[in-house]
Structure formats: structure tokens, C-alpha cells
């Protein structure tokens, strides 16, 4: 395995009074793909939420290392700025908010800078081309009427931007 991009060490996570994860260890290297599989209720989603910093999930032991930095105590917004992203099985549909507007707003929140529209649209177009995604999706309401595959492409686009 290459140097770990994400390393979970002896992670213990609880929700309210119930410990869900009991000493989980995991290492994911750069350019590796891992799949978590198991029956319902075995902690797959809990691990994802703990990695993203969802405050409902309390890390009571262990650590989460991302790009060599311990992010265990960072709030969710700081983890997101570092590139931590959780893809949902059924992403929310947001009528009235275009995919383009959503991504631009998220980028501005991440960077703290107001993005020039021309520069943003250029980067958006280039990134959509990488995904073989029709540019018209940028002006559609976020995930509204998207097929399952289009929703996944939308999430990947958000992550890449």
C-alpha cells in the first residue's frame, strides 16, 4: 500500500449512549478504492459520518488522520475545506437552486473569496467535460429530475470543484 491518504486508528464512536464503533482501523492510500460492505447496523454509515465530523457522532477514542494531519477534533466545515466529502445513496433535490449556484456558493464558503463569474464558469465547464457531463446540467435545479447516475456525477462534480 502507498502512503495513507486516510488513516483510521483504533476509532471508537458513540451516538448518544450507544457505542457503535469499537476500535476500527483502516488505511486508504492515494489512488486506492475501498468498499465498506456489511449488513445493516454494522457501522458503515457511522464511520462515514464520524470521518466527516457530524456532531451527532462522538469520537470517544482513536484518531482520524487525513493527508498526515489529525483531523479528529476539527469541525465539519474545516474537514470539508480539506477535501472530506460524503456521497449519499440518495442525494437531496433542491428545487430553485441550480447546480452551478450551489457549487459556486460552496466554493466561496470554502475559500472565503468571492469568485469571478468568468473564472468559475470556465473551471466548471472544464470539470464537467472531464465527467462527460452535458453543460446544461449546470443550470438545472440541484439533482431535480436527475437519474441516479446523473446524481452521482453531480456529486463527483461538486467534489472535484
Where are these regions (language model features)?
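ABC ATPase NBD Q-loop/coupling interface
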Residues: 63-79, 143
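Conserved structural motif at the start of ABC-family nucleotide-binding domains
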Residues: 6-8, 21-23, 28
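The feature captures the beta-strand-to-loop junction immediately N-terminal to the Walker
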Residues: 37-42
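Short coil-to-beta microelement around the adenine-binding A-loop and adjacent beta1/P-loop entry
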Residues: 15-21, 78
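ABC-family P-loop ATPase nucleotide-binding domains
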Residues: 92-161
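ABC nucleotide-binding domain signature
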Residues: 35, 80-89, 129
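Short hydrophobic beta-strand immediately N-terminal to the Walker A/P-loop
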Residues: 34-36, 48
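Helix-to-loop junction immediately C-terminal to a conserved catalytic motif
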Residues: 52
Amino acid at each position: 500500500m502507498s502512503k495513507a491518504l486516510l488513516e483510521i486508528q483504533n476509532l471508537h464512536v458513540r451516538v448518544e449512549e450507544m457505542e457503535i464503533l469499537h476500535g476500527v482501523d483502516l488505511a486508504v492510500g492515494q489512488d486506492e478504492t475501498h468498499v465498506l460492505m456489511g449488513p445493516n447496523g454494522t457501522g458503515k454509515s457511522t464511520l462515514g459520518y464520524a470521518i466527516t465530523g457530524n456532531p451527532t457522532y462522538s469520537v470517544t477514542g482513536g484518531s482520524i488522520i487525513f493527508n498526515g494531519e489529525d483531523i479528529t477534533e476539527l469541525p465539519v466545515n474545516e474537514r470539508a475545506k480539506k477535501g472530506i466529502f460524503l456521497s449519499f445513496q440518495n442525494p437531496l433535490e433542491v428545487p430553485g437552486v441550480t447546480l452551478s449556484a450551489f457549487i459556486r456558493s460552496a466554493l466561496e464558503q470554502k475559500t472565503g473569496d468571492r469568485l469571478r463569474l468568468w473564472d468559475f464558469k470556465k473551471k466548471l465547464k472544464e470539470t464537467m467535460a472531464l465527467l462527460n457531463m452535458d453543460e446544461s446540467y449546470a443550470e438545472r435545479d440541484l439533482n431535480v429530475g436527475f437519474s441516479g447516475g446523473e446524481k452521482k456525477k453531480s456529486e463527483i462534480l461538486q467534489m472535484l470543484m
